[in-house]
Amino acid sequence: MTEVTVVIPYRDRGIDPLRPANLRCVIEHWDGCDVPVWLSDDGRVGDAQFNRSQAYNRGAWFVDADVVVFAEADMLVPYSQIRQAVAMAAAAPGLVVPFIQYRYLTPEDSGLVRAHDIEPGDCIPESTMDNGESIGAINVVSRETLDAIGQWDEVFEGAWYDDVAMKIAFEVCAGPTRWVDGPAWHLWHKPGLGGSHLTAEDKAASARNKERLELYRQATTPERIRELTAGGH
């Protein structure tokens, strides 16, 4: 039997009260899926840039699972799609994304979902990303696939671009990305790219991530990918 664990990366920077509210909703959601859930922080404190890769690596180190579902703290997805993604990840190496349509819920509907007054599937999304355009919000990988890339690249911090880089890493080292047909829903919070709430360092971190992504776009071998995920340049 395939052992599965959900790893949720999270640390509250104290900036947006909707983020911990979303986390509570997401944990309640996963409680119904009958798989262990591991909440993993990045080892940093205060309002330091959140390092999702560090949180993922810490979680992967602590859990003993054949397949790990790396799922963000603001995402909801049907259990049936998770079960299908786990089976796909266990059957062959490579990244599996357990949805093909990313639905951004409105602030109002997100509040209703958190309050259990409406199901996410009954909401009209603020916008959507179709045909697998969205990468990174939920990643399902086998231990073999994770070992193939070495680890999540901890040079990335803050918001944006790390997800695209890691998709490249998985594809170079483990084969094509696969998707499960179906939706996932994003609970609204202050955005990580754009807005008056972002600090100069928030913007600088995203700019550094964008520059680092180019190294992944130039990488063509598993050896080079593992150099990068280990922190190389």
Where does each model-flagged region fall?
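Short, well-formed alpha-helical segments that are part of the catalytic scaffolds
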Residues: 10-31
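Conserved glycosyltransferase catalytic-site signature
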Residues: 52-57, 75, 134-138, 159-167
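Short beta-strand-to-loop acidic/aromatic patch adjacent to the donor-nucleotide binding site
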Residues: 65-76
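C-terminal catalytic/acceptor-binding lobe
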Residues: 15, 155-233
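Active-site-proximal specificity loops/subdomain of glycosyltransferases
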Residues: 38-62
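Conserved catalytic core of nucleotide-sugar-dependent glycosyltransferases
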Residues: 78-154
